[in-house]
């Protein structure tokens, strides 16, 4: 995938629509548009073996962290009606993201 355009931004709340974490909701930590992937808080958890490093004050062991999932596997969550698609309202710089179901503003999320 190369440079996917998306309406999902950092700190948005999204719901996972497919995969092993289907049904979970979380906050977007990072969007990686050139790979078409997204990091969602507490979704796609993997175990990472960490080597101790006393200089950086890092304790060794097995750490859990989020792994990236495909942007196509998530849907933006509207506060009123739940997971939804995104519509756009306005022109030019006045353009804003709105819920496709109920029309409420999603920009302030």
UniProtKB/Swiss-Prot annotation:
Cross-referenced InterPro entries: KOW, Rib_uL2_dom2, Ribosomal_uL24, Ribosomal_uL24_KOW, Translation_prot_SH3-like_sf
Annotated region (Disordered), positions in chain: 1-24
Subunit structure: Part of the 50S ribosomal subunit.
Source organism: Koribacter versatilis (strain Ellin345)
The name this protein goes by in its record: Large ribosomal subunit protein uL24
The family this protein is said to belong to: Belongs to the universal ribosomal protein uL24 family.
GO molecular function, one term: structural constituent of ribosome
BP-aspect Gene Ontology terms: translation
Originating gene: rplX
Purpose: One of two assembly initiator proteins, it binds directly to the 5'-end of the 23S rRNA, where it nucleates assembly of the 50S subunit.
A Pfam family: KOW
Keyword Membrane on entry: no
Keywords of this entry: Ribonucleoprotein, Ribosomal protein, RNA-binding, rRNA-binding
PANTHER family for this protein: MITOCHONDRIAL RIBOSOMAL PROTEIN L24
Source domain of life: Bacteria
């Amino acid at each position: 995938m190369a440079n996917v355009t998306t309406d999902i931004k950092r700190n948005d709340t999204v719901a996972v629509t497919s995969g092993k974490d289907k049904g979970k909701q979380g906050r977007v930590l990072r969007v990686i548009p050139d790979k078409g992937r997204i990091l969602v808080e507490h979704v796609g958890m993997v175990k990472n073996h960490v080597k101790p490093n006393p200089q950086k004050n890092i304790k060794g062991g097995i750490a859990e962290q989020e792994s990236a999932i495909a942007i196509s596997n998530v849907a933006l969550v509207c506060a009123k009606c739940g997971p939804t698609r995104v519509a756009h309202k306005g022109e030019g710089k006045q353009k804003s993201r709105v819920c496709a179901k109920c029309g409420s503003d999603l920009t302030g999320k």
